[in-house]
Amino acid sequence: TVRRMARDLRKALPNSIQVPNNQCVEFIPTKTGGRYRVEDKSGAPGTGLDFSAADTGFNMLGSNSARPADQQIADGDLIAVYNLGIAGSNAYNGDNTAAVSGTPSESGSPAETTITIASKQFPLPSGSNRFHVIPGTEKVVSYICSGGTLYRNANYAYSSSCPAPTPGTTPVIATNLDTCNFVYNGSDLQRNGLVQMTISFTNSGETVTQYHEIHVNNTP
């Protein structure tokens, strides 16, 4: 249980982890990332990502089709650039995200991938020219402890508080929970965040407590 949550959290978009209350941890997942071309060049491929005005596409350095299937950028995914998790650069609010429109195409040698997006002016460029990819089928995830059960909720409309799980519908990760506590320390760490999870299970009068610390990369 804890290991699965740790795997999920390590893939979280930088600066997207939050704990609305100690019974819930919420984050924006990512499936992959890449580097965008900064400047146009003559010939194809040659489209840089423009930060001075709304743009509808850019070139990624490298091949999309060469990636594992679950990491390939697809129609409906979201491109996120330099998420700081603050006003004006907050992926939860769509400040710095744009939806991929259509299937990315490749050309050139070495290969570059042309990614078409919904018109967007990204507020801030990445110092390392990086972007992250949020899966279109799972744009936000939360783990919620409720009524002695640990749920994994996904792809719901974002709000300032974790949504209540729907028993019988929301996927169950674990049952027989006795206590559950999530703590996140990220704002006072320059590059990394720390998620602390304490979960106790009780069954047949016996209690087992699992404690885990997960270091997450907050470099956008």
Where are these regions (language model features)?
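Short linear sequence signals and composition-biased patches located at protein termini or domain-edge surfaces
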Residues: 35, 147-220
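Extracytoplasmic beta-strand-rich oligomerization domains located immediately C-terminal to a leader/signal peptide
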Residues: 1-151
